[in-house]
């Protein structure tokens, strides 16, 4: 249905939804409700409820719909109302949006209820707005906000919208209605060209009256000089400076260039913003690498010495085992056997064999094992006890 023309018209509701997305007339209905609330020049909850009933906003969720479309419509309705609750809208529009969120949340037909999606980056602004309500003693609006928090109506998320793979790279920015927008330059709104012209006329008339009243027409009496003569010029200069500052703030590219000396002096101290991140990362990396403790040379030598000692101990164990086996072999042969001349001539060969035993594992044949076994049995056989008759 179209935009409500009168107070008794029914707003565009769930019956017009054909797919996912904002219904075509829902935003128009919201702006109509908020504009009428703005015209009342009030922030009272009772005034908003009167408009809510007259526009029949309670029937916004009525209509035959399946549960899936009902949930999607409720999410979109709450998300659209949430936009008017954030800056740069005026204080009165934000209060009206708070009442609108309260009405939509409590009249929805979803079970369980759909929550209001709130990005974490916006929550600080919301808390600041709640503090402003308390300071201004708008307790009805503060009570509505507290009731929503107690009902756990807010769903805190990282992003304002649910991200997916099909999201566009460039997110479309919503346009703010000019009549709902909070003026960012209140000075220029207060002091216009007409106001300056009127102030100039009053100041000239004041100076003329001082000359007319004083005895000396050329020099007015000092007792009559209650306002400085350059009062208007000072105000005019301040307004012009504010205009230039506001333009530079909006468009930094319009900022006048400095002189060569100043530019060179400040250019070395100020780095471009795009390089700040790279510089900070480089500092972090340098600090991380400098924290690594290098291994001292003494440890390396100590470690190599330990390795060499291990190898020496290993070779010493091999030598000890070979010596033990050599001792066990000596009694294996007959005690009265004499060495032949051939064995005497082969003495250097035996020494070489002993050296090779120190370096490699000894090889024991089966005959030697039998001989060693017999020797061990002979050594460790216990003497038999004689039986007593």
From Swiss-Prot:
A GO term for molecular function: DNA binding
Asked whether the keyword rRNA-binding is assigned, the reply is no
Q: Where is the composition biased (Low complexity)?
A: 1-15
- Residues bearing the modification Phosphoserine: 308-309
Any keyword Manganese?
Answer: no
Gene Ontology annotations for the cellular component aspect, listed alphabetically: nucleolus; nucleoplasm
Task: Enumerate the residue ranges of region (SNAPC3-binding).
Answer: 20-187
- Annotated region (SNAPC4-binding), positions in chain: 183-287
* Region feature Disordered, mapped onto this chain: 1-22, 245-276, 290-389
InterPro entries membership: SNAPC1
Basic and acidic residues composition bias: which ranges?
Answer: 245-262
Q: Which UniProt keywords apply?
A: DNA-binding, Nucleus, Phosphoprotein, Transcription, Transcription regulation
Superkingdom of origin: Eukaryota
Q: Which Pfam families does this entry report, sorted A to Z?
A: SNAPC1 (PF09808)
Query: What is the annotated localization of this protein?
Result: Nucleus
- Record function comment: Part of the SNAPc complex required for the transcription of both RNA polymerase II and III small-nuclear RNA genes. Binds to the proximal sequence element (PSE), a non-TATA-box basal promoter element common to these 2 types of genes. Recruits TBP and BRF2 to the U6 snRNA TATA box.
**Assembly and interaction partners:** Part of the SNAPc complex composed of 5 subunits: SNAPC1, SNAPC2, SNAPC3, SNAPC4 and SNAPC5. SNAPC1 interacts with SNAPC3, SNAPC4 and TBP.
Q: State the name under which the record lists this protein.
A: snRNA-activating protein complex subunit 1
